[in-house]
Amino acid sequence: RDQPRSRGLGDVYKRQRQTNKYSDDRPYQFVKSTDGGNTWTRQMVIDPFPCVTDNMMEVYNGQVTYQPAGNGQKERIHIAWTICGEKLGKHAHATYGRNVYYAYLDPSNDHMYNVEGIDLGTTIDNEESDKYCQVLETPIPERGHSAGLQVSVHYRDNSYPVVHYQYPEENAARLSTWDAGEWKHLTFEAKGEPRGIEKLGPESFRIYATMGRGAITFVTNDGGRSVKKEAEIVTPFSLSRCYWIENARPKLKLLMFSNPLPDAPKTLATANRDVYVAGINE
């Protein structure tokens, strides 16, 4: 979900990755406007460079979620991510990937904090990520990614995060939640790529994923401690993206984009994807 996030105070945060000299050096930043978009400033919030064990310095993530102040909690912007790149001695784009991380940004001072509230300053470096922000530590993989590229996060009413990502080791998906001072992990059967988390209630969430020719939804009603499959939506062609629309009309809950169509021209000047919409019976 790449759209800017507004605090309703004239402040807008836009997230993006910075592309540096090497294809596997892509740190993560917020671009912020305090005057409704007239002027912007940059803040590097996650920078894995330099990494001594490998060249996995690309930050990948999915849904970023803004939490307004309420219920005795300060406002914050929740972020979860994984790192990708190459092994030592080579540079390549997203060849391997490992680990899952979480932190949040406090808009009152633009500092980053880990789940326990430790102030990590305006930028989280490689050592701070591993020491303070790890949700899941995985070994350097022999091939592929230890966690999927799309790592999404939402928040429970107590401000603790719910993190959703692929877990290739078990050919499944995972929800990770913070509870009793530690990360708790729920692995559940689900193919496809995570595409967002919708908050339904204090501890209830709908989880979206693309799966070949369609999308699939799951629901948890206990903050990620258990999950059940809810629905499947079938499309004529395989999907590349699926976005849930906040405050949508019932029949326009999902916006979906196909992969390039088999017989379509492969040029930028010609449309070659389908766009679908769908509703969900609440």
Question: Can you describe what each PLM-predicted range is?
Answer:
Residues V45-M56, E116-G144:
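Surface-exposed loop and turn segments in beta-propeller and other repeat-based domains
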Residues Y22-V31, E86-Y101, E169-S176, G212-V219, ...:
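Structural motif
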Residues D2-Y13:
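Single conserved hydrophobic/aromatic residue that forms the stacking wall/gate
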Residues D11-R15, G72-I79, D157-V163, P202-I207, ...:
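Entry beta-strands of beta-propeller and related beta-repeat scaffolds
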Residues V52-D54, E58, H185-E198, V227-P250:
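Conserved blade-ending motifs and adjacent loop-strand segments that build the rim/top face
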Residues A147-R174, F188-R225, W244:
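Loop/turn-rich, solvent-exposed surfaces of beta-rich toroidal or solenoidal domains
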Residues T41-D47, M112-N126, H185-A190, K228-I233:
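Beta-propeller fold detector
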Residues S33-T41, L105-Y113, E170, T177-H185, ...:
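Asp-box/BNR beta-propeller loop motif
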